[in-house]
Amino acid sequence: EWNVVAINKNNEPITHIFVTSKGYGNGESGLGSEQKTSTLRHFFQEIPAGGYVTVEPMLPELFHLYNEYWVSYFIGNQIYDKKFIFVPDSIVEENLIEITPLGLQGILHE
């Protein structure tokens, strides 16, 4: 089972976290018609310093697509945005590493 997890690596909490996710691409062979998933939106009030929250499950049926996560959050009164894109077929066991805050193996995108 694969999950998308937001990890706060800051020394202070982040608040008002808004995550938008979507998948898109040209099919498994790269030659097919355009494919895209629904756009999903998630909100989290706070992630404490060094904490994490599970955003959503990631389905293996979507690994052949670009999987994009756009994260907006506040530290104090300052807003930040980050975009994370998992390229097609990058979510594979060969790319697993130890993710210390979770105590699990996974694929870390920074």
Annotated model-derived regions:
Residues 9, 24, 75-77:
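Short, flexible beta-strand-to-coil junctions
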Residues 1, 28, 108-110:
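Short N-terminal segments
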Residues 27-69, 76-79:
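Intrinsically disordered, low-complexity Pro/Gly/Ser/Thr-rich segments with frequent PxxP/GP/PP motifs
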